[in-house]
C-alpha cells in the first residue's frame, strides 16, 4: 500500500532504505519521544525494523518529501494493533523537517486509510513532555481520554507518563459517505 499527499509520499520501507532511515531517526531528541525504538539507533536496527513482519492490513510507512529530484526521507508513520486490540496511530519526523506540518499531513492520510478500512476509532499517545506531538494530535482531531499511563521508553531507559488520545471515526462506511456527498 502507498499513499500520496500534496507534499509527501508514504510507502513501505525497503532494505535499501536502512542507511537513510538510521540517519533520519538517529537523534536522541526523536527517539526519546518514541516508546519502543532502541537508542542509540544503528543501521543494523534499521535493517531489522525493515525486515520485521508487518500486519497484512494495517500500513506501516516511511514518509518521503516529494521533491524535484529523488524523494527525501523525513520520517515514518503507521497504524498498529495494541495488545488491547485497539488500533494506534504513530509517527515520527526527522529533526531537519520539524515544524513543516509533515506529521499532520501524514496523519491525515493515515486517518483516511483507517476510514477506508472501516475502523471505528484510532488511539494515539504522546509523552507528557512532548507538546509538539500533542499539537499534532489535536490538529488531527484526537481528544484526550483523561488517562495518563506510564509507557516504556528505551532512550530514557525508564517509563515516562503518556497521555492517551482517541479519535472516533465516522460510523458510516466510506462508500455510504461518498454517495451522501
Language model features with spans:
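Conserved GNAT-fold acetyl-CoA-binding loop/helix
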Residues: 29-51
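Residue-level recognition of short, structured coil/turn motifs
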Residues: 35, 58, 116-119
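Acyl-donor (CoA/ACP) binding surface of acyl/acetyltransferases
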Residues: 1-29, 63-181
Amino acid at each position: 500500500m502507498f499513499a500520496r499527499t500534496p507534499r509527501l509520499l508514504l510507502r513501505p520501507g525497503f532494505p535499501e532504505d536502512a542507511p537513510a532511515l538510521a540517519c533520519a531517526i538517529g537523534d536522541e531528541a526523536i527517539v526519546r519521544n518514541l516508546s519502543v525504538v532502541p537508542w542509540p539507533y544503528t543501521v543494523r536496527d534499521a535493517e531489522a525494523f525493515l525486515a520485521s513482519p508487518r500486519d497484512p492490513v494495517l500500513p506501516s510507512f516511511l514518509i518521503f518529501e516529494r521533491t524535484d529530484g529523488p524523494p527525501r526521507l523525513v520520517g515514518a508513520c503507521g497504524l498498529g494493533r495494541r495488545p488491547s486490540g485497539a488500533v494506534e496511530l504513530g509517527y515520527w519526523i526527522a529533526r531537519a523537517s520539524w515544524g513543516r506540518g509533515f506529521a499532520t499531513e501524514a496523519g491525515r492520510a493515515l486517518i483516511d486509510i483507517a476510514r477506508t478500512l472501516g475502523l471505528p476509532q484510532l488511539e494515539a499517545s504522546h509523552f507528557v513532555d512532548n507538546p509538539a506531538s500533542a499539537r499534532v494530535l489535536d490538529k488531527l482531531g484526537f481528544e484526550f481520554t483523561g488517562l495518563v499511563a506510564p509507557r516504556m521508553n528505551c532512550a530514557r531507559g525508564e517509563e515516562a507518563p503518556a497521555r492517551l488520545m482517541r479519535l472516533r471515526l465516522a460510523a458510516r462506511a466510506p462508500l455510504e459517505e461518498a454517495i451522501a456527498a
